[in-house]
Amino acid sequence: MKRFTWLLLAFALLVAPAHSANLKWAAQNDILTLDPHSQNHATTNSILQHTYEGLTRYTKDYKVEPCLATSWKQMSETHWRFNLRKGVKFHDGSPFTADDVLFSFNRIRQPQGTMQIYVTGIKEVKKIDDYTVDLLTDGPIPILLRNIIDFRIMSKAWADKTNSQNVQDYAKKQETFASRNTNGTGPYLIKTWEPDKQIVFAHHKGWWGKLDGNVTDVVYTPIKSDATRVSALLAGDVDLVTDLPVQDVDRLRKSANTKVLDGHEVRTIFIGMDQHNDELKYADVKGKNPFKDVRVRQALNMAVDREAIRRVVMRGLSIPAAIMVAPGVHGHSKDIDRVMKYDPNGAKKLLAEAGYPNGFEFTLDCPNNRYVNDERICQALVGMWAKAGVRARLNSMPFANFIPKILN
């Protein structure tokens, strides 16, 4: 039950000279933390990528290019050598060296964080000299250079000084110096963060690279209400909105004072079913877990009318999908990206075969402020599953509450 969603953004058209500029940016969500190794959360990652950098990064056309590493060589299938960029300074003025890469590797792997996925398969990082490191892997990793883009480097000296050697335990609501302060090597430093109010960026004048554009100061404001966010754009209170509600797209396209850019994202939205617990929590089935039976999972998949969601809920701005890899991403295959046919009667038969002729009841936890139309999509799923005899109780909540519940 997956879908590719559309990337929608709009910005106000302003007539201004091309000198340094301030950008007022709004989106639905706030970040969860400033700790770059704590939470694998899209909004948090998209904000922190301007402050903390990795060894590699993406170009505008989604290709890998050097960042804190200037070059690399694959010595063998399981051995990579990276040459580090010299002369790079952290925001506090301290130099970037191989020690920071080793420290960050050991830090990101700590179990209380959720960013370990970006170093999966890397068993060791070795320092060759101050500006050379080797990455040793468990086996061949063809996407290693892409994975480590989000392996962001923190200053070892700064972490030692501020007692930030350990990753914040977000699930336990821990607060640390690194969860409220930053010290990266990126083009922008974060001056202040007021949770649920605003984040203030300033250009890091000591950045090793060259700014693409003239934006020197940025104020990011999370605005949860779709209507309020769009009104702020039309009133000129913000310059850019990066998660437009689909119902306002046509109106904004027709406005002489705004421009809408759109295209499909590489993110895939999916419904996660608990296949771990022997007894399904928050359900009326006791002593067992229906989702462990592949026929039940297939039935719920078969009961979803993706085309109706695309047409009605998403107003044409989504792509039905059968696999996690999106079009445009290396590894996508049209041959296997074939959506299961919508068949509620077939779903009922599968449920009966699995021992649930009368269906069952369970709780569907759903964020209501993270993805475009997330709660409306969940509402549609509840109705579709009901036609197959499965009763889902919708439990929608802010994403800040959703993540700790899922992690726990």
Predicted stretch roles:
Residues K73, I117-N166:
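Surface-exposed binding/hinge segments that line
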Residues T176, K205-R251, V294, V382, ...:
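Ligand-site clamp/hinge motif
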Residues M302, I319-E353, R370-E375:
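Structural transition elements
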Residues A98-S104, T132, G186-P187, V215-D217, ...:
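Alpha-helical secondary-structure segments
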Residues A26-S76, N106, N183-T185:
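N-terminal lobe/hinge region of extracytoplasmic solute-binding protein
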Residues T70-T114, I128, D134-G139, R229-A235, ...:
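Aromatic- and charge-enriched surface segment that lines or borders ligand/interaction sites
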